[in-house]
């Protein structure tokens, strides 16, 4: 396993394809990091599917309804756009056309996606298990989708 230097700011995501370890960026998107950690600690993401997986682009999850239209019961977040680029393994919040509409849905980039830079709130980076993300079933929507089996803050393990 990758060395976890800051367990309080590291997510361990268990999926139907294997483990994914994500380093959080509290200095870049503090509100989004707190939301991700809070929902993970509540078990919100456990059992949630990857409902939208586009080859060469990204894998999206975080909607408890599995449709891409749902979210948590918490208020939407204010955008925290930054200079952090959307690269392979970047974790960023999904949103509607309203920049301040991120809630619980997020995506992991398969490749560089410069059109997302400064338009979506980046909150982390995959540091281990990107090969498992690469194995997620593709589709919009995905038929018989892969899912998150558990999502935890490393400090709690």
List where the protein language model places each region.
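Cyclophilin-like peptidyl-prolyl cis-trans isomerases
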Residues: 1-157
């Amino acid at each position: 396993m990758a060395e976890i230097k800051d367990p309080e700011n590291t997510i361990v995501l268990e999926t139907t394809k294997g483990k994914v370890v994500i380093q959080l960026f509290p200095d870049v998107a503090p509100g989004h990091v707190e939301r991700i950690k809070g929902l993970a600690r509540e078990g919100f993401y456990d059992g949630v599917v990857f409902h939208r997986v586009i080859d060469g682009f990204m894998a999206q999850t975080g909607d408890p309804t599995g449709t891409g239209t749902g979210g948590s019961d918490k208020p939407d977040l204010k955008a925290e756009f930054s200079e952090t680029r959307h690269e392979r393994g970047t974790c960023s919040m999904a949103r509607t056309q309203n920049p301040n509409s991120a809630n619980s849905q997020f995506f992991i980039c398969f490749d560089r996606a410069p059109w997302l830079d400064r338009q979506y709130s980046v909150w982390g980076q995959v540091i281990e298990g990107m090969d498992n993300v690469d194995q997620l079933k593709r589709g919009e929507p995905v038929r018989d989708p892969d899912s998150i089996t558990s999502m935890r803050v490393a400090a709690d393990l």
